[in-house]
Amino acid sequence: MNHSSIEVANKQGFAYAIGAALLFSCKPIIIKWAYSYGIDALSLMLLRMILALPVYLLIGTIIIRKRNIKLPAKHWLSAAFVGLFGYYLATLLDLKGLELANAQLERIILYAYPTLVVVLGAIIFKHKVTKQQIGALVLCYAGIICIFLQDLSLQGKQVIEGSLLILLSALSYAIYMLFSKKHIDRLGSLLFTCISMTSATFATIIHTSIALSYGELNPNEWVLSNELMAIVLLLTFAATIVPSFMISEAVSRIGAANAALTGTVGPIMTSIMAVALLGEIFTLHHGIGMVLVILGVSRLKPKTIPEQKQPEKKQTAEGSQ
């Protein structure tokens, strides 16, 4: 692959990452709409996963048959295990946190995960942290902290609990991002995403079954109306299926750290939608925080990514059709 081809792949990777961030930024807004109909976090997660499962199973089956993939069981199990961090544990903690915190705060805290990806990568894999990354992170998270402290002073103790849950969600997602690269290189981004979402769905089904058996979940407390079903469908396709494939494609091109850093634009879009659609408060602190985040993102420039292998290129082209 020549230099121009690498630059094209690099730009495509950042485009996928930004697109995924924008779609993911809609997620807390949609979830808040769903909560207004009385549904709980685990039930919402189950509906979302079950609706998405057929899509991932279909795409995964097509890829396996077309590429005639034959790998040891340990590779499949390892990919499924990593997927649990990104699409089961991180999602569950995030949904639980959103029951207590508002949409703007959720998106701000969740975007601590780029820092965690960079730090964990440096500690575990000895990845180099550039001065540009450090400077960008300082600006971004100065803005994040500014907004966080403002919301914390306005809403009280429940925000603390919600924030902790969402912070744990960010940590779980950072682990997923960090360990997903080798599986994407081995399986391809689309197939790995299918495996991850499938394993997360079955984990959610098991969790729900246990919760029902212990009386911790009462489905009679909410009604699956046409309006709620429409919201769940929107959450499933616009804020789950499409961005999950896009972020995997981004990681396969530019790596976990760069994909994570680019996604920092998410809080800005969430704040705009939260104010416009949910009526959340937007103060001077929020404005200052958003400016700092924008300045931080502006310092992030694409890095030259390693040359891609030809099989992965073919698989990526199939996924873009």
What is each PLM-predicted segment?
Residues S43-P54, T91-K128, Q133-I134, S169, ...:
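Specific alpha-helical transmembrane segments that line the substrate/conduction pathway
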Residues A21, L47, L105-A112, M177-F202, ...:
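Helix-helix packing/entry segments at the starts of transmembrane helices
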Residues K11-A15, L42-I62, F81, Q132, ...:
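Hydrophobic alpha-helical transmembrane segments of multi-pass integral membrane proteins
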Residues L23, P28, L57-L110, C146, ...:
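Specific transmembrane alpha-helical segments of multi-pass solute transporters/efflux pumps
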Residues I29-Y37, L98-E99, F148-V159, A211-E227, ...:
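Membrane-interface helix termini and inter-helical loops of multi-pass transporters
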Residues M1-L47, Q155-K182, F202, I206, ...:
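Glycine-/small-residue-enriched transmembrane alpha-helix faces in small-molecule transporters
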Residues Y56, L120, V129-D151, T264, ...:
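Hydrophobic transmembrane alpha-helices of multi-pass small-molecule transport proteins
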Residues S25, G83-Y88, L92, T115-V119, ...:
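Hydrophobic/small/kink-forming positions within alpha-helical transmembrane segments
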